[in-house]
């Protein structure tokens, strides 16, 4: 069947915009962040099979290399009989499947960009579109990439296929390309003539209706949200690394043997000089490694290669080649052999880590780790790389000893007249003129059997003098920093700084008299009040810093009645905390917090602020728990820390603190038990599920009479009980219309429960009943409207409409779950991030209180009224309210 010319013109426009350009990389699949995740041709057993004819099983196994350099536009504008179609098989029969393969046509000279591979689904469908639908299908094809964009979810792609099957019924039985799935990146790929990426799995759907059936079965599954989007290559390859393609690499042992053999020769003749020069010029290969060619491609990774184009060995080789070419002409014949050996010695020394402390030796691991490149066809090569790196270090150390033995063994060269190097001896034509630059090395491509090695990380060479210098500088800078810090701390101690009202630092003669001698000792509340600024001598000066740090300016004088009211309020707060009376806390928290803030302003005492923050937080946490049934561990931890600080300040708690009460109520919450049982019942099937739901409703009705239920418990009980009864009513109803309405209502109740409880429960009985009722209704109403279609098409379209209904329900559930996720994320940020920060701030305030004199003040006032029936703790200073200078209760 030929493609309609109108549809062909639409594909021409799409390919011009969304196909891989001629200069693009056609051998790799990328994810939305442009990171490579898949490749083609890496493993032959996973390649997609191709077919150019019918169903010949032998031809199905052939792999055909299609040229990709053809111009897409000219190919599409050519005669219809010369279109560049290739026939693929969309089945998995080659890999053990049982479904019969059907050949389908795809582009032979074009591949879609990463992220737009879903367009391959429409290529074989284009051949089955009838002429009456050609214009509509062309518009559909041209608009689809702009509507979906790159990397749409599988759910979006399947919805598009469902829409296409509804508009163009003739494609319901059409074949579709193989869809591959990568378990590593969680991404799908619709294959083209490049086949299945290496190590990817295959989705078992060969036709449109099979694909739509898969969509129906996958409603609510996580993989429906995965994106739909490859030859191996190096990731993170940089432009600065392109020089490696022209660098000359040689096997380390081959170069070592060549140089060792060169040390045994006599160079009094030109033939020996020319032979060594030719051997050095032809040693190794270029084009050993590139972005798309692994180092060293196809070799044993244990083989070590030497880069002759990197310094310092390139410099030593250049000197040796220059001497062999023209440098020897100015020397006596008797000295040439000795001089050649000296140059060879220098080259050997650069190969030894014992002499040079730096090496140009690589294996696969060192190349990839040192240059931070990753071969995208492999995963988890870390342990292998470490082993190869260790092997490289051992190899270089062993060869360094061997090179040292060679140097000692060949101090007296042996004359061997018939010596020939192992490499080709043909020397290049060399001009007799004096060269003006380094001797050039001919470019020799790496043969097919000599493919490069693999990666290892060799530690960079160490300079012990540099390390010693860095250590000394670090010690000096650390000492200077410590001295400066100590000086700043001492200066800060001598400055006037904020203190609590019962501790002041004053200066001057009169201050000394008031403090009982000793300049600037701490003033206790029982002593003389500090002298006013008017009585200070002219020697006592105030600066802007003094004014800013004088906390007495913030103190407030209160009358006796107000102080008495505050004292009574404080005692009520202590009693409520001791008795863990949430009723009093909820009723009076606003008034108590206001009074505590006024106390803190009058007294300047940190425990008042801590207590106000604790009351405010514990009220919010308890209210939130009763309304939502949830409290985070971070919130409880912050309150436990505050309670410890308040205990240290003298606030007594009963046997159970408010935080422990909330924790115990959360652990014993009836709603949590009902939620757990409800989730367990959701996994049951058939009549057992209906009976279990009825039993759960009876249990809830029994426990609803309890008086200690929270608002959340009441809400959960009402919702779950109503749904359980609704399911029972549905099972007893026989009228299909009434039953469908009840199912819709019960489904809405189920979604509401998921939103309230934060669950993702789906009762199988409701889904099965709803599917059965919708199927019956569609079958009854659909046959009359499709009189011209075959029974198979009618059945397939009925299934498609059922999928639409399922997809709509899935979208509603997804929207509900998305709202739950957003609310949960906000609650998590509030409870797990902000609450710990507040807790740390509260602990910091407590620490500031004790560090600034709170303990000294309490030591001067050990007596404090205790709670009824509780004896005061001995041996520990007790916090007492209203001792500051501002309220003047120091009598």
UniProtKB/Swiss-Prot annotation:
Modifications made to the protein after synthesis: The viral RNA2 of bymoviruses is expressed as a single polyprotein which undergoes post-translational proteolytic processing resulting in the production of at least two individual proteins. The HC-pro cleaves its C-terminus autocatalytically (Potential).
Name of the protein: Genome polyprotein 2
Keyword Protease carried by entry: yes
Pfam families: Peptidase_C6, TMV_coat
EC number per UniProt: 3.4.22.45
Family: Belongs to the bymoviruses polyprotein 2 family.
Active site: 117, 189
Organism: Barley mild mosaic virus (strain Na1) (BaMMV)
Enzyme class: hydrolase
Domain Peptidase C6: start-end pairs: 109-229
A biological process term (GO) from this entry: proteolysis
Protein encoded by which gene: RNA2
GO MF entry, a single one: cysteine-type endopeptidase activity
Residues the record marks as site: Cleavage: 229-230
Region (Disordered): 502-540
Catalytic activity annotation: Hydrolyzes a Gly-|-Gly bond at its own C-terminus, commonly in the sequence -Tyr-Xaa-Val-Gly-|-Gly, in the processing of the potyviral polyprotein
């Amino acid at each position: 069947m030929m493609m309609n010319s109108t549809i062909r013109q639409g594909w021409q426009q799409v390919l011009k915009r969304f196909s891989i350009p001629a200069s693009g990389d056609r051998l790799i699949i990328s994810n939305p962040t442009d990171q490579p995740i898949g490749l083609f041709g890496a493993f032959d057993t996973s390649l997609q099979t191709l077919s150019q004819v019918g169903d010949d099983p032998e031809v199905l196994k052939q792999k055909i290399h299609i040229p990709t350099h053809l111009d897409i536009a000219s190919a599409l504008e050519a005669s219809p009989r010369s279109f560049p179609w290739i026939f693929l098989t969309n089945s998995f029969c080659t890999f053990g499947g049982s479904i019969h393969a059907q050949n389908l046509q795809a582009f032979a000279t074009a591949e879609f960009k990463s992220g737009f591979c879903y367009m391959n689904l429409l290529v074989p469908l284009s051949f089955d579109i009838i002429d009456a639908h050609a214009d509509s299908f062309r518009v559909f094809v041209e608009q689809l990439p702009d509507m979906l964009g790159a990397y749409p979810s599988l759910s979006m792609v399947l919805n598009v296929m469902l829409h296409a099957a509804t508009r163009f019924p003739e494609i319901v039985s059409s074949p579709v390309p193989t869809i591959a799935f990568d378990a590593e990146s969680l991404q799908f790929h619709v294959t083209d003539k490049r086949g299945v990426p290496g190590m990817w799995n295959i989705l078992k759907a060969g036709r449109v209706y099979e694909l739509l059936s898969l969509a129906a079965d996958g409603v609510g599954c996580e993989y429906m949200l995965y994106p739909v989007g490859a030859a191996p290559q190096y990731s993170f390859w940089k432009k600065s690394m392109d020089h490696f393609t022209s660098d000359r690499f040689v096997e380390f042992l081959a170069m070592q043997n060549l140089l060792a053999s060169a040390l045994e020769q006599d160079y009094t003749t030109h033939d020996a000089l020319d032979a060594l020069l030719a051997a050095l010029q032809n040693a190794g290969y270029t084009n050993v490694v590139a972005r798309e060619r692994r180092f060293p491609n196809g070799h044993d990774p244990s083989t070590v290669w030497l880069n002759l184009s990197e310094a310092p060995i390139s410099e030593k080789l250049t000197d040796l080649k220059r001497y062999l070419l023209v440098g020897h002409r100015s020397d006596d014949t008797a000295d040439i052999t000795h001089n050649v050996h000296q140059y060879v010695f220098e080259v050997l020394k650069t190969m030894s880590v014992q002499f040079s402390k730096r090496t140009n030796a690589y294996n696969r691991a060192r190349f990839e780790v040192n240059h931070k490149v990753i071969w995208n066809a492999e995963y988890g090569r870390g342990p292998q790389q470490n082993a190869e790196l260790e092997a490289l270090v051992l190899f270089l150390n062993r060869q360094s000893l061997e090179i040292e033995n060679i140097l000692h063994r060949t101090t007296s060269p042996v004359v061997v007249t018939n010596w020939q190097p192992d490499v080709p001896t043909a020397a290049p034509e060399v001009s007799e003129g004096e060269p003006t630059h380094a001797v050039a090395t001919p470019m020799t491509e790496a043969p097919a059997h000599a493919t490069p090695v693999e990666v290892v990380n060799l530690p960079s060479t160490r300079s012990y003098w540099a390390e010693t210098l860095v250590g000394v500088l670090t010690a000096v800078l650390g000492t200077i920093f410590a001295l400066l810090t100590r000086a700043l701390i001492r200066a800060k101690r001598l400055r006037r700084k904020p203190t609590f009202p019962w501790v002041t630092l004053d200066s001057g003669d009169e201050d000394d008299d008031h403090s009982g001698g000793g300049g600037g000792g701490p003033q206790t509340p029982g002593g003389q009040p500090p002298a006013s600024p008017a009585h200070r001598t002219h020697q006592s000066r105030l600066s802007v810093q003094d004014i800013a740090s004088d906390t007495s300016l913030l103190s407030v004088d209160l009358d006796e009645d107000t102080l008495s009211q505050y004292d009574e309020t404080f005692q009520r707060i202590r009693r409520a905390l001791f008795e863990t009376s949430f009723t009093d806390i909820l009723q009076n928290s606003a008034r108590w917090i206001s009074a505590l803030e006024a106390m803190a302003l009058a007294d300047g005492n940190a425990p008042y602020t801590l207590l106000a923050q604790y009351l405010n937080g514990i009220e919010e946490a308890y209210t939130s728990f009763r309304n939502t049934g949830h409290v985070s561990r971070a919130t409880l931890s912050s309150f436990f820390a505050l309670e410890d600080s308040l205990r240290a300040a003298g606030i007594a708690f009963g046997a159970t603190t408010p935080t422990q009460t909330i924790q115990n109520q959360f652990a014993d919450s009836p709603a949590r038990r009902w939620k757990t049982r409800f989730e367990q019942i959701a996994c049951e099937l058939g009549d057992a599920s209906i009976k279990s739901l009825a039993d759960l409703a009876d249990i809830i009705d029994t426990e609803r009479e309890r008086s200690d239920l929270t608002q959340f418990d009441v809400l959960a009980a009402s919702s779950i009980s109503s749904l359980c009864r609704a399911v029972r009513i549905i099972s007893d109803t026989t009228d299909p219309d009434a039953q469908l309405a009840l199912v819709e209502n019960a489904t809405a109740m189920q979604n509401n429960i998921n939103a309230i409880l934060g669950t993702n429960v789906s009762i199988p009985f409701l889904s099965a009943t709803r599917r059965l009722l919708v199927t019956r209704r569609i079958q009854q109403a659909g046959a009359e409207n499709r009189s011209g279609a075959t029974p198979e098409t009618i059945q397939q379209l009925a299934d498609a409409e059922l999928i639409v209904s399922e997809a709509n329900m899935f979208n509603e559930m997804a929207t509900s779950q998305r709202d739950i996720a957003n609310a949960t994320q906000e609650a998590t940020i509030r409870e797990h991030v902000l609450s710990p920060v507040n807790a740390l701030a509260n602990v910091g305030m407590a620490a500031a209180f004790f560090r600034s004199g709170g303990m000294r003040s309490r030591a001067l006032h050990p007596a404090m009224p205790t709670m009824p029936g509780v004896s005061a703790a001995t041996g520990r200073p007790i916090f007492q309210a209203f001792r500051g200078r501002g309220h003047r209760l120091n009598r």
